[in-house]
């Protein structure tokens, strides 16, 4: 039940909340269903205000009851009931669609569970490892190359689900045309070594590199390096505990503010989400995902052509605010609260990370976080305007 900060949630809460989602929206679709415990609507609802009030996120760590044993029993009970209805073929088509959404929702929380555990263990003075057996891979980074892309009018986004086959969140739709001016994208994400140069050059002390709110946050919280880098300059905290930092691996746990400041220092900028998605179109979704079981960004062998590590390793901050696409329509009913109401004061990230399930990601996937969020596996790929 450890909760290391207001933005994180205890592992027990993640387990209960994802189970509650199936109970509330799948089993609860039957008017005759009686909930496991009506009070849990309050405890494990996250933000669905149309259902009713929810226990405040900063206080989730105070929920000593129900116990972990009770939560695990709850997961077993609800899972058994859902599986029985699925096997019996008694679920309505609309409920089956919600079941699919529930599986996608569970995958999102699998990643959040890992990032929240990592933050909690880092806050522990002992620096415990979540997985002491995690292997590390050290390979020399490819030279950073600039890949020129011509101006084009193309399409981004996804066809609305479930009207069209293939799951996509409502914030990914509708598919629409965009004009993308000529630009260049970096061949790979920024490495730890490159980010260390930014620090050594006074990047965290140079106000002119920072957005105003970013500089204020940097000063208020005394940011001097990425979240999990040790002050000794050589180590970083991982889910395997404190480890020597691989200079060639993608830098991670950056806020939007830090990513933007680095880009300015490098004479570049962050890519727009349209630039990113058009570059990703047709690129195979392979990379270092949670399925790889590294649970940390990895350096890869040099490659001569193409974009490297576009998927997996680190979510890549874009310079695009999280806003609705033209013609956006949220899902109907309570599930309309899933994405649309958060379309303010957040920024889009793309590509997935080492904590993302491989089959959860796609080129059109829009992750989003506030500009000061640092505890996710977020890094940066640079872009430049073409002359």
Predicted regions and their residues:
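A conserved hydrophobic secondary-structure block that centers on an alpha-helix together
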Residues: 89-97
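Alpha-helical, largely C-terminal catalytic domains
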Residues: 82, 86
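Functional-site microenvironments in short loops/helix caps that host divalent-cation chemistry
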Residues: 102, 106-108, 112, 116, ...
């Amino acid at each position: 039940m450890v909760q290391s900060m207001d933005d994180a949630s205890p592992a027990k809460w993640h387990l209960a909340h994802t189970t509650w989602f199936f109970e509330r929206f799948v089993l609860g679709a039957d008017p005759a269903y009686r909930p496991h415990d009506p009070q849990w609507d309050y405890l494990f609802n996250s933000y669905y205000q149309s259902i009713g009030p929810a226990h405040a996120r900063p206080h989730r760590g105070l929920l000593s009851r129900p116990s972990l044993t009770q939560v695990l029993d709850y997961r077993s009970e609800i899972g058994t009931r859902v599986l029985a209805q699925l096997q019996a073929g008694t679920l309505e088509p609309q409920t089956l669609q919600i079941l699919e959404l529930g599986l996608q929702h569970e995958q999102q929380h699998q990643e959040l569970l890992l990032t929240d555990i990592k933050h909690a263990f880092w806050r522990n003075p002992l620096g415990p490892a979540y997985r002491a057996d995690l292997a590390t891979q050290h390979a020399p980074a490819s030279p950073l190359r600039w890949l020129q892309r011509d101006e084009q009018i193309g399409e981004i986004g996804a066809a609305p689900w479930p009207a069209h086959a293939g799951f996509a969140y409502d914030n990914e739709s509708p598919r629409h045309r965009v004009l993308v001016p000529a630009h260049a994208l970096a061949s790979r994400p920024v490495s730890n070594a490159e980010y260390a140069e930014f620090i050594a050059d006074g990047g965290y002390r140079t106000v002119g590199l920072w957005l105003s709110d970013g500089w204020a946050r940097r000063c208020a919280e005394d940011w001097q390096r990425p979240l999990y880098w040790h002050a000794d300059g050589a180590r970083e905290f991982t889910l395997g505990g404190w480890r020597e930092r691989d200079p060639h691996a993608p830098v991670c746990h950056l806020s939007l503010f830090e990513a933007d400041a680095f880009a300015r220092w490098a004479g570049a900028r962050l890519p727009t989400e349209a630039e990113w998605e058009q570059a990703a179109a047709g690129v195979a979704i392979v990379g270092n995902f949670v399925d790889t079981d590294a649970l940390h960004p990895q350096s890869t062998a040099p490659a001569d052509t193409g974009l490297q590590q576009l998927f997996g390793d680190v979510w890549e901050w874009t310079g695009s605010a999280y806003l609705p696409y033209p013609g956006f329509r949220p899902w109907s009913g309570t599930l309309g609260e899933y994405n649309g109401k958060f379309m303010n004061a957040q920024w889009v990230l793309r590509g997935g990370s080492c904590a993302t399930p491989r089959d959860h990601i796609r080129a059109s996937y829009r992750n989003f976080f506030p500009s000061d969020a640092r505890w996710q596996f977020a890094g940066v790929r640079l872009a430049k305007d073409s002359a």
